[in-house]
Swiss-Prot record:
Residues 496-505, 893-902, 1466-1476 have a biased composition (Pro residues). Its main location: secreted. Residues 1-35 form the signal peptide. The gene is COL24A1. This is Collagen alpha-1(XXIV) chain. It comes from Homo sapiens. Residues 487-1481 are annotated as: Disordered.
C-alpha cells in the first residue's frame, strides 16, 4: 500500500518510492492527529440532538447519529447525515446551542446536498421576528443575511443534487465564502460590526420560520467555529461521514487507522472540497468523470489530478504544438513515456506526439491534430481541458471517431503489456473533464479585479450557456472512444437513466482471447441481436497483472442463449452520441391524457400591435342578451357651449324614481371650489384583479432605491385561460444537418406545424436543453395504458404552492437603483362597482359644461322595471311597421288588470287575407320617417266565418306591404267568451286612442291571486297622464276582457289639478267588471287600401318573467358642483338620541348667602312637548321599612308596562338640615308632562336657600370648564294653562339618586307659606315644630339645585308634581357616524310619517333613436315625439312594504322652564310612501340620500323652456341635522340596550349617575352589537360588571375570548365566589397532616392556579365541610385579584372521587369586574 509511488514496468514498487511513500504516510498520520487536536467549534447538529461529536472522525459504524431520542417531524438520520423533508421544523432558543457572546470573527462550516430547488434558509437566528443571521440558498445564489443590513450575495448554487461543502467567514467589515478547501472569494459588501446575539434569540434549522419554505435535502455537517483561520483550510474540519458522502475523499486528514475506502463510486462527482484537486474541480458539476483508479494487489489507490493549465500555456494549445506542454509550474513534469524507471513522486502528464509504441504512432498524431483544430480558444479567464477543445468542432467527431477509438484502444492495450498504463492515464484525465454546466460562472462569485490573476485558480474557456448544449455529446463521444474496459472501479450509486443507444448489428464471433482484467460496469445499451454461443475461453491468469490478449476478429452471431438470472442493476450509462435524425415515424395511437404539466415560464411579451383600421359601421343587430360591461368609450370632443336657455316653468313634482343608469362621461368641468367634507363612505368590496398587461420594454438599470418595507402577501391569482392554438404551418423539406450554431436569443413559442410524413424510427437523442414552455394543449382522449417507463430525470420545480401564511418580517434587501419612468400601462378593466357610498353635501354650483357630442348607439340594455308616469308628452306620429316577429310561446295568463275607461270605437279595417309567413329578414337600417298616410275608406265588415281547425305553423313568409286603413265597420255585438286560443302572430300596432274620461273610484277590491307571467309584449307609447284623482281604495281584480278595437288617438287633454292624497284603504272585495263604453261616432270613410297581410290580433300573452337586473354601470365621473339647494322643510321629529357621556365633575361651589323666597313668576309660553324623560327624583320618603331580599332582575322587554296607579301623598317628613351643594349634575331628558299631583300636606317651613345667580344659557358645546354664574334673569310671563293631558305611558325606571351629605343643623325659621315640594334632602335632625303661618305670596320658581352626591338606594317615592314644560333647546351639532348595528328585532308599528318632499322635474333629453326598453330612469320632462310602440303587458301589483322600525331614542334636550301642561295635539299628517323593498334599519345614508337626491335637478344643466323654482328645504335639513345630532348623542351616551350597548357597566354609571341595578347589555370591543352580551350591572357596588355563568353548577360563562379579553383590559379588579357543597367530604382548605385536607386547586382564565398556601391563595369565607355529620355543608372561596385576566375560575382541579357516602357539587356565582 504505497501512496503515489512510482512503479517499474513490471509493476513493482521501486525502493526509493517505498521510502518516500512511508514518509508521506507518516506525515499524513501526524497531520490527522494535529487536526484532531485542534478546536473543532460548535457542532450545531450535535447540539440539536441530531448527531454526536464523535461522528467527526469516527469510523463509518459510529458515524450514524444516534436515534435513541425521538426525532422531530420530517427529520431522518442516515449515514450521510440528517435528511430534512418539507415538513421538518426545528427551532430552539439560541442560548441552548450557541454562546450569547459569540462575536466576530467566526466561520460557518457546512456540508449538504439539496434535493429540491427553492429559496429556503439553511438556518436563521431571529430575535422578535427580526433576522439577525441567516444563510439562504437561492436557486443560483447563496445569500448571507446579517442583522437586517445589506446581505452578501454569492453566485454559488447548491441546488444540483450534488454534495457541497463550503465555509462562510464573517469578519468586522466583510463576509467571505470559501469553497474547494480554501479558494477564497471576497465579498466587496461592507457591513457594520456585528454585535453579540441577544439571549432571547431563536435558532431555526432548515427555514427562516415555520411559515416559510423549508430546506429539503441532507445536511452532513453544520459547525460554527469561533475563528476566521479555519476557513482557509476548512477541509481539515470536515467530518468523516461527510468525506464518505459520495465524494469527499481528501488525503490531508486520513486517520492512521483507516486508509481510503476501496468502495468509491466510480461515477461519483469529484469533490468540491480540496484545493489540490485538478482542473475538474472547476469544470465538473454533473458528477460524470472517469476516476483515476488502477487496480494492483487488490488495493485501490487514488491519484491526485494536478493538471492545471495556466494562461501562458494556452497559447501552445492554440498554435497546435501540443507535444511539449510544460506543466512544471504546477508540479507536473513532462516525461517520456518510454522510460525504465523514474523515482519522481508526481505522475506526469504528457500530451505529446511521442510514440506510445512504434506501431501506434498514428493515434497521438490524430489526437494532437484534433486538439490543434481549435481556433477559438481565447486567453480570458478560461479553463482548458481535453474535452473542452472538442466544443468548437462537433462536426469533426464522426470523422475521427473510428480511427481514434481503435488506435487509442490499441495504445492502451499495448501499454498494458509493457506496464505503461500509468503514463497513459494523464492523457485520459485531460481528455475527460467537461466544462461546467452551472448556471453561474464556475459556481462561485469571482470578484477578481480586472487584470488580476490567481495562481491557484483555473479559467474556463467557455463559461456561458452556449457550451452546455454540447457537453453531453462530447463527453459521451470520448467515453465511447475510450471504453474503460480495463479500469474497473467499485460500483457507484445509481444515476438517472441515460437515453437508450441504437441496437448494434450482430458481428461474427471472435476468437477466444485471454482473460483480461475485469472492467467497470458498462453502459446499459440496447439489447443486440442474439449471437451464437461462443466456445468457452481459457481461464485467465490470476496472480499478478495479466497480459491482455490481442483483440480477436469479430465472431459470428451466436444463437440465443437461455434467459439468465436477472443481473444487478447497472450503473448509469453515459449518454450516447446523438444519432442522425430519423425519418418521421408513423403516428402512434393517442396516449392517455397526461397529468397537467407544470406551468410554463412566463413568456416574453410580444410587441404591441398597431391598432387596426376602423371598420365600417354594421347593421344594428337584434337585441342580444345583456353582455358584460364593456370598456369605457373614448371621450367625445367637447361641443360648443350653448346659450343659456330660458328658465322654464315649474313642473309637477314627480315621484322619486329608481336610480337611473350612469350616463356617459362628460367633459371635465372647471375645477370647483373645495366643498365641505362628505360623510365617510362605506368600505367598498375588493374588485377582481385585472389582467396583467403586456410587459414593457426592459429599461436600463436604475439607481439603487431605498429598501421598501415588506409588502403584504398578495392573494393567489386566478388561473388564466388557455390561449388559442396557432395555425399549423406547412411541412418543410428535410434539410441537411448543419453545424450547430450558438444559441440565439430566446424566441417566442412558434405555431405548431402540420404533421409531416412519418419517418423511420431514429435513435433516441441525448436530453436537450430545457425548452420553452408550450401552450397548454387541449386534453386528448384516453389512450391505452402504455408500458411502464424508465425512471425519469428529476422534473422541473413544481408549480407554486398554495398561498402561505403571513411570513415574519424578512431582512432588509439591498437598495435598488431608481428605475426610469415606465410607459403608462394600458387601461385596466373596470373593477366591480363598490357599494354605494354616502352622498356628499351639495357643493357650490359649478360652471355649466359644454354639451358633448352624441355618443355611438350602445347595445340594447335589458328591460328595466316600470318607471313612474312622466309628464304628458305630445302626440307622436305612428312609427314604421317593424318586421313580424315569431310566434311566442304560450305564456301563463297574466293577472287581470283594473278595467280602464272605454275609449271610442275605432274604425275596423278589412281583414286581409293571411299570407304565408316569410322568413325574417335581417334588420334594416333605420329609415327616415315617412309621411302620414291618408285615412282609408271604411270597408264592409265581412261575415264571421266558422272557426277552423288550427293549422300547423307554416314557413315564415315575406313581410307584406302595409295596407291602407279600411273603412270603419259597425261594431258587432260582443260574442261569447271563447276558449283562449294559442297566441297568434303579433298584429300591427294601432294608433293611440283618445284620452278616456276619468273613471270613478271603484270599490275596494280583494287582492287577486297572482297569475302566471305572460309573454313580454312590445313596449307601447307612453300614455297621457290623467287628472290625479283622490286615492281610492284598491278595487277588486276584474276578469280579463276581450281585447277591444284600438281607438283613434284623442286630443291632448289639459293638465289636471293635483288631488289630495287619500288615506290608504284596506283591500276591498272583488269588484264587478265595468260597463261597456258608449259607442263612438262614425268616422269618415278612409280610402280603401290594398289588402294587407296583417295577422290576426292574438290574445294577450302571459306576463313575462321579470328580467334579471342588468349589471350595475360603472360609476360616472364626478359631475360639476351643483347649485346650493333650497332649504329643506322642517323634518319630522327624529327618534330620541342616546344618552351623552358624562362631563367632568365640577368643583364644589362656595356656599352662597341665604336668599329670600322669590315671588312666583308668571308662567312662560307653552313649550314644545318634550321627549319622554327619565323618572324624576324620588319624593319624600316614608319611614324606612325593613330591607327586603334582593329580587331577581326583571325580563328585558321593549314594551313598556301600563302606567301604575296614582299614589297617595306621603306623610310629611321631618325637616332635614340643608346639605351643601353637591356636584353639578347633568341635565336630564325633558319629561313628558305628567298628571298634576294632588296637593300635599303643608310641610314644615324650610330655611331660605342660598340665592344663586342666574347662569347664561349657552349653546351645547364640548365639555368645558364650569362657567361663572350669571346675573339673575327676569321671570317669564305666565303661560296659558294647558288642558288636562292624557295619562302618559309609564317611563323607564330612573336610576336611584344618591343621598346627600348631612348638612349642619338649620336655624329655626319663621313659618313660611306652603312651598312646592322640595328636592329630597338627607335625613335631618328633628326640628322644632313651627306655628302655622299665614299663606304667603306665591314665590317664583327657584333654580334647580345641584344634585347631591349619590346616596344609598332609597325607597320608591311618591310621584312629584309635573314640571312646567320647558322651551325647546338649541339644536345640537352634527355628530359622527356611529358604528354599524345589528338588525334589531321587529319594532312596533310606527306612526305615519310626515309627507316627504316632492322631487324636481327632470330636464328634457335629446331625441334619440328608437331602441329597446331601457332601465327606467327618473321621470323627465316632455320629450320630443317618439315612435309609436306596441302596448306592453300589465305589470304586477307591487307588494306593500313592511312598516319601518322605531328609531333610536332622541337626544336629551336642555332643561326648559317649567310650563303648564299643554293640550293634546292633533294627529299629524300622513307620512310619505315608503321606499321600495324591505328596509331593515334606517341609517344615516337614507336621510342624507333622500335629501340630496331631492336636489338632483339642481345639478343638471339648464335647458330652455324649463323653469325650476327652489323649494324651501330648511325644515328637512334641520330634521336631518337633528337626527344626526341625536345619533351622535346616542353613541356618546349608551343606554345599555342591545341596540345601544355600553362597553362596561361603569360607562353607564359615568354617563347617568342615577341608574339602578339590573340587567344591561354591554359590548366591550365596541364592534357590531351582534356580539353584545347581557350582564348584571351592580351600580350599588360602584358599577360592577357581573357575568353570570351559563349554569350555577358549571364554570362556563358563554363569553368569547375576544370580548373577555377586552373586558379584562377595561377593568382593574375582579371578584369571583365559588361554593363547594359537600357531604361527608374532608376539609378543603387545610394541607396540614393533622387533618384529611385536600390540596385542591382552582384554574383561572389565564391558566394560573389558585391554591392554598400560595401567592394565589383564595380567601376562604367559610369551610363547614369539616363537619361530617351526614348533612350537607359548604365551603365558600372568594377570589379577588387586581389582575382581571386571572378570573373567572374555569376549572376546579384535584377533586376527590365521588363515593356513595361522599358527595359534593359546585356552585359558581357571577364573576364581577370593576
Amino acid at each position: 500500500m504505497h501512496l503515489r509511488a512510482h512503479r517499474t514496468r513490471r509493476g513493482k514498487v521501486s525502493p526509493t518510492a517505498k521510502t518516500k511513500s512511508l514518509l508521506h504516510f507518516i506525515v499524513l498520520c501526524v497531520a490527522g492527529v494535529v487536526v484532531h487536536a485542534q478546536e473543532q467549534g460548535i457542532d450545531i447538529l450535535h447540539q440539536l440532538g441530531l448527531g454526536g461529536k464523535d461522528v467527526r472522525h469516527s469510523s463509518p459504524a459510529t458515524a450514524v447519529p444516534s436515534a435513541s431520542t425521538p426525532l422531530p417531524q420530517g427529520v431522518h438520520l442516515t449515514e450521510s447525515g440528517v435528511i430534512f423533508k418539507n415538513d421538518a421544523y426545528i427551532e430552539t432558543p439560541f442560548v441552548k446551542i450557541l454562546p450569547v457572546n459569540l462575536g466576530q470573527p467566526f466561520t460557518i462550516l457546512t456540508g449538504l446536498q439539496s434535493h429540491r430547488v427553492n429559496n429556503a434558509f439553511l438556518f436563521s437566528i431571529r430575535n422578535k421576528n427580526r433576522l439577525q443571521l441567516g444563510v439562504q440558498l437561492l436557486p443560483k445564489k447563496l445569500v448571507v443575511h446579517i442583522r437586517g443590513k445589506q446581505p452578501a450575495v454569492f453566485n454559488y448554487s447548491v441546488h444540483d443534487e450534488q454534495w457541497h461543502s463550503f465555509a462562510i467567514t464573517i469578519r468586522n467589515q466583510s463576509v467571505s465564502m470559501f469553497v474547494e478547501c480554501g479558494k477564497k472569494y471576497f465579498s466587496t459588501e461592507t457591513i457594520p460590526e456585528v454585535q453579540t446575539f441577544d439571549s432571547n434569540s431563536v435558532f431555526t434549522l432548515g427555514s427562516m420560520n415555520n411559515n416559510s419554505i423549508h430546506f429539503e435535502g441532507i445536511v452532513c455537517q453544520l459547525d460554527i467555529i469561533p475563528s476566521a483561520e479555519a476557513s482557509a483550510d476548512y477541509c481539515r474540519y470536515v467530518k468523516q461521514q461527510c468525506r464518505q458522502a459520495d465524494k469527499y475523499q481528501p488525503e490531508t486528514s486520513i486517520p492512521c487507522t483507516t486508509l481510503i475506502p476501496t468502495k468509491i463510486p466510480e461515477h461519483s462527482p469529484p469533490p468540491k472540497l480540496f484545493a489540490e484537486k485538478v482542473l475538474s474541480e472547476d469544470t465538473f458539476t454533473e458528477g460524470k468523470s472517469i476516476p483515476n483508479i488502477i487496480k494492483n494487489d487488490s488495493e485501490t489507490v487514488y491519484k491526485r489530478q494536478e493538471h492545471q493549465i495556466s494562461r501562458s500555456q494556452l497559447s501552445s494549445l492554440q498554435s497546435g504544438n501540443v507535444s511539449a506542454v510544460d506543466l512544471t509550474n504546477h508540479g507536473i513534469q513532462a516525461k517520456e513515456m518510454i522510460t525504465e524507471e523514474d523515482t519522481q513522486t508526481n505522475f506526469s502528464l504528457s500530451v505529446t506526439t511521442h510514440r506510445i509504441s512504434e506501431a501506434k504512432m498514428n493515434t497521438k498524431e490524430k489526437f494532437s491534430s484534433l486538439l490543434n483544430m481549435s481556433d477559438n480558444i481565447t486567453q480570458h479567464d478560461d479553463r482548458v481541458t481535453g474535452l473542452s477543445l472538442f466544443k468548437k468542432m462537433p462536426s469533426i467527431l464522426p470523422q475521427i471517431k473510428q480511427d481514434t477509438i481503435t488506435n487509442l484502444k490499441k495504445a492502451i492495450t499495448a501499454n498494458l503489456h509493457t506496464n505503461e498504463l500509468m503514463e497513459m492515464q494523464p492523457i485520459l484525465n485531460t481528455s475527460l473533464h467537461r466544462v461546467t454546466n452551472e448556471p453561474s460562472v464556475d459556481n462561485h462569485l469571482d470578484l477578481r479585479k480586472e487584470g488580476e490573476f490567481y495562481p491557484d485558480a483555473t479559467y474556463p474557456i467557455e463559461n456561458s450557456y452556449e457550451t452546455e448544449l454540447y457537453d453531453y455529446y462530447y463527453y459521451e463521444d470520448l467515453n465511447t472512444m475510450l471504453e474503460m474496459e480495463y479500469l474497473r472501479g467499485p460500483k457507484g450509486d445509481t444515476g438517472p437513466p441515460g437515453p437508450p443507444g441504437p441496437a448494434g448489428i450482430p458481428g461474427p464471433s471472435g476468437k477466444r482471447g485471454p482473460r483480461g482484467i475485469p472492467g467497470p460496469h458498462g453502459n446499459p445499451g440496447l439489447p443486440g441481436l442474439p449471437g451464437p454461443k461462443g466456445p468457452k475461453g481459457d481461464p485467465g491468469f490470476s496472480p499478478g497483472q495479466p497480459v491482455p490478449g490481442e483483440k480477436g476478429d469479430q465472431g459470428l452471431s451466436g444463437l440465443m442463449g437461455p434467459p439468465g438470472m436477472q443481473g444487478d442493476k447497472g450503473l448509469k450509462g453515459h449518454p450516447g452520441l446523438p444519432g442522425l435524425p430519423g425519418e418521421q415515424g408513423i403516428p402512434g395511437f393517442a396516449g392517455n391524457i397526461g397529468s397537467p404539466g407544470y406551468p410554463g415560464r412566463q413568456g416574453l411579451a410580444g410587441p404591441e400591435g398597431n391598432p387596426g383600421p376602423k371598420g365600417a359601421q354594421g347593421f344594428i343587430g337584434s337585441p342580444g342578451e345583456a353582455g358584460q360591461l364593456g370598456p369605457e368609450g373614448e371621450r367625445g370632443i367637447p361641443g360648443i357651449r350653448g346659450k343659456k336657455g330660458f328658465k322654464g316653468r315649474q313642473g309637477f313634482p314627480g315621484d322619486f324614481g329608481d336610480r337611473g343608469p350612469a350616463g356617459l362621461d362628460g367633459s371635465p368641468g372647471l375645477v370647483g371650489g373645495t366643498g365641505p367634507p362628505g360623510f365617510p363612505g362605506l368600505r367598498g368590496s375588493v374588485g377582481p384583479v385585472g389582467p396583467i398587461g403586456p410587459a414593457g420594454i426592459p429599461g436600463p438599470m436604475g439607481l439603487s432605491g431605498n429598501k421598501g418595507l415588506p409588502g403584504i402577501k398578495g392573494d393567489k391569482g386566478e388561473q388564466g385561460t388557455a390561449g388559442e392554438l396557432g395555425e399549423p404551418g406547412y411541412p418543410g423539406d428535410k434539410g441537411a444537418v448543419g453545424l450547430p450554431g450558438p444559441p440565439g436569443m430566446r424566441g417566442k413559442s412558434g405555431p405548431s406545424g402540420q404533421t409531416g410524413d412519418p419517418g423511420l424510427q431514429g435513435p433516441s437523442g441525448p436530453p436537450g436543453p430545457e425548452g420553452f414552455p408550450g401552450d397548454i394543449g387541449i386534453p386528448g382522449q384516453n389512450g391505452p395504458e402504455g408500458p411502464k417507463g424508465l425512471l425519469g430525470n428529476r422534473g422541473p420545480p413544481g408549480p407554486p404552492g398554495l398561498k402561505g401564511t403571513q411570513g415574519e418580517e424578512g431582512p432588509i434587501g439591498a437598495f435598488g437603483e431608481l428605475g426610469p419612468r415606465g410607459k403608462p400601462g394600458q387601461k385596466g378593466y373596470a373593477g366591480e362597482p363598490g357599494p354605494e357610498g354616502l352622498k356628499g353635501e351639495v357643493g357650490d354650483q359649478g360652471n355649466i359644461g359644454k354639451i358633448g357630442e352624441t355618443g355611438p348607439v350602445g347595445l340594447p340594455g335589458e328591460v328595466g322595471m316600470t318607471g313612474s308616469i312622466g309628464e304628458k308628452g305630445e302626440r307622436g306620429s305612428p312609427g314604421p311597421l317593424g318586421p313580424q316577429g315569431e310566434k311566442g310561446v304560450m305564456g301563463y295568463p297574466g293577472p287581470p288588470g283594473v278595467p280602464g275607461p272605454i275609449g271610442p270605437l275605432g274604425l275596423p279595417g278589412h281583414v286581409g287575407a293571411r299570407g304565408p309567413p316569410g322568413s325574417q329578414g335581417p334588420k334594416g337600417q333605420r329609415g327616415s320617417r315617412g309621411p302620414d298616410g291618408l285615412l282609408g275608406e271604411q270597408g264592409i265588415q265581412g261575415a264571421k266565418g266558422e272557426k277552423g281547425d288550427q293549422g300547423k305553423r307554416g314557413p315564415h313568409g315575406l313581410i307584406g306591404k302595409t295596407g291602407n286603413p279600411g273603412e270603419r265597420g259597425f261594431q258587432g255585438k260582443p260574442g261569447l267568451q271563447g276558449l283562449p286560443g294559442s297566441t297568434g302572430d303579433r298584429g300591427l300596432p294601432g294608433e293611440p286612442g283618445l284620452r278616456g274620461l276619468q273613471g270613478d273610484v271603484g270599490p275596494p277590491g280583494e287582492m287577486g291571486m297572482e297569475g302566471p307571467p305572460g309573454t313580454e309584449g312590445e313596449s307601447g307609447l307612453q300614455g297621457e297622464p290623467g287628472a290625479k284623482g283622490d286615492v281610492g281604495t284598491a278595487g277588486s281584480v276584474g276578469g280579463t276582457g276581450e281585447p277591444g278595437l284600438r281607438g283613434e288617438p284623442g286630443a291632448p287633454g289639459e293638465e289636471g289639478l293635483q288631488g289630495k292624497d287619500g288615506l290608504k284603504g284596506v283591500p276591498g272585495g272583488r269588484g264587478l267588471p265595468g260597463e261597456d263604453g258608449e259607442k263612438g261616432e262614425m268616422g269618415l270613410p278612409g280610402i280603401i287600401g290594398p289588402l294587407g297581410r296583417s295577422g290576426q290580433t292574438g290574445l294577450p300573452g302571459p306576463e313575462g318573467i321579470v328580467g334579471i337586473p342588468g349589471q350595475r354601470g360603472r360609476p360616472g365621473k364626478k359631475g360639476d358642483k351643483g347649485q346650493i339647494g333650497p332649504t329643506g322643510e322642517v323634518g319630522s321629529r327624529g327618534p330620541p338620541g342616546k344618552i351623552g357621556k358624562s362631563g367632568p365633575k365640577g368643583a364644589r361651589g362656595t356656599r352662597g348667602a341665604v336668599g329670600h323666597l322669590g315671588l312666583m313668576g308668571p308662567d312662560g309660553e307653552p313649550g314644545i312637548p318634550g321627549y319622554r324623560g327619565h323618572q324624576g327624583q324620588p319624593g319624600p320618603s316614608g319611614l324606612p321599612g325593613p330591607k327586603g331580599e334582593k329580587g331577581y332582575p326583571g325580563e328585558d322587554s321593549t314594551v313598556l308596562g301600563p302606567p301604575g296607579p296614582r299614589g297617595e301623598p306621603g306623610p310629611v317628613g321631618d325637616q332635614g338640615e340643608r346639605g351643601e351643594p353637591g356636584a353639578e349634575g347633568y341635565k336630564g331628558h325633558v319629561g313628558v308632562p305628567g298628571l298634576r299631583g294632588a296637593t300635599g300636606q303643608q310641610g314644615p317651613p324650610g330655611e331660605p336657600g342660598d340665592q344663586g345667580e342666574q347662569g347664561l344659557k349657552g349653546e351645547r358645546g364640548s365639555e368645558g370648564n364650569k362657567g361663572k354664574k350669571g346675573a339673575p334673569g327676569p321671570s317669564g310671563k305666565p303661560g296659558i294653562p294647558g288642558l288636562q293631558g292624557l295619562l302618559g305611558p309609564k317611563g323607564i325606571q330612573g336610576y336611584h339618586g344618591a343621598d346627600g351629605i348631612s348638612g349642619n343643623p338649620g336655624k329655626i325659621g319663621p313659618p313660611g307659606k306652603q312651598g312646592l315640594p322640595g328636592i329630597r334632602g338627607g335625613p335631618g335632625r328633628t326640628g322644632l315644630a313651627g306655628a302655622p303661618g299665614p299663606p304667603g305670596v306665591k314665590g317664583s320658581s327657584g333654580l334647580p339645585g345641584s344634585p347631591g352626591i349619590q346616596g344609598p338606594k332609597g325607597e320608591q317615592g311618591l310621584p312629584g308634581q309635573p314640571g312646567i314644560q320647558g322651551k325647546r333647546g338649541h339644536r345640537g351639532a352634527q355628530g359622527d357616524q356611529g358604528p354599524c348595528g345589528d338588525p334589531g328585532l321587529k319594532g312596533q308599528p310606527g306612526e305615519y310619517g310626515v309627507q316627504g318632499l316632492t322631487g324636481f322635474q327632470g330636464f328634457p333629453g335629446p331625441k334619440g333613436p328608437e331602441g329597446d326598453a331601457g332601465i327606467v330612469g327618473i321621470s323627465g320632462p316632455k320629450g320630443p315625439i317618439g315612435h309609436r310602440g306596441n302596448t306592453g303587458p300589465l305589470g304586477r301589483e307591487g307588494i306593500i312594504g313592511p312598516t319601518g322600525r322605531t328609531g333610536p331614542r332622541g337626544e336629551k334636550g336642555f332643561r326648559g322652564e317649567t310650563g303648564p301642561q299643554g293640550p293634546r295635539g292633533q294627529p299629524g299628517p300622513p307620512g310619505p310612501p315608503g321606499a321600495p323593498g324591505p328596509r331593515k334599519q334606517m341609517d344615516i345614508n337614507a336621510a342624507i340620500q333622500a335629501l340630496i337626491e331631492s336636489n338632483t335637478a339642481l345639478q343638471m344643466e339648464s335647458y330652455q323652456n324649463t323653469e325650476v323654482t327652489l323649494i324651501d328645504h330648511s325644515e328637512e335639513i334641520f330634521k336631518t341635522l337633528n337626527y344626526l345630532s341625536n345619533l351622535l348623542h346616542s353613541i356618546k351616551n349608551p343606554l345599555g340596550t342591545r341596540d345601544n350597548p355600553a362597553r362596561i357597566c361603569k360607562d353607564l354609571l359615568n354617563c347617568e349617575q342615577k341608574v339602578s341595578d339590573g340587567k344591561y347589555w354591554i359590548d366591550p370591543n365596541l364592534g357590531c352589537p351582534s356580539d353584545a352580551i347581557e350582564v348584571f350591572c351592580n351600580f350599588s357596588a360602584g358599577g360592577q360588571t357581573c357575568l353570570p355563568p351559563v349554569s350555577v353548577t358549571k364554570l362556563e360563562f358563554g363569553v368569547g375570548k375576544v370580548q373577555m379579553n377586552f373586558l379584562h383590559l377595561l377593568s382593574s379588579e375582579a371578584t369571583h365566589i365559588i361554593t363547594i357543597h359537600c357531604l361527608n367530604t374532608p376539609r378543603w382548605t387545610s394541607t396540614q397532616t393533622s387533618g384529611p385536607g385536600l390540596p385542591i386547586g382552582f384554574k383561572g382564565w389565564n391558566g394560573q392556579i389558585f391554591k392554598v398556601n400560595t401567592l394565589l391563595e383564595p380567601k376562604v369565607l367559610s369551610d363547614d365541610c369539616k363537619i361530617q355529620d351526614g348533612s350537607w355543608h359548604k365551603a365558600t372561596f372568594l377570589f379577588h385579584t387586581q389582575e382581571p385576566n386571572q378570573l373567572p375560575v374555569i376549572e376546579v382541579q384535584k377533586l376527590p372521587h365521588l363515593k356513595t357516602e361522599r358527595k359534593y357539587y359546585i356552585d359558581s356565582s357571577s364573576v364581577c369586574f370593576l
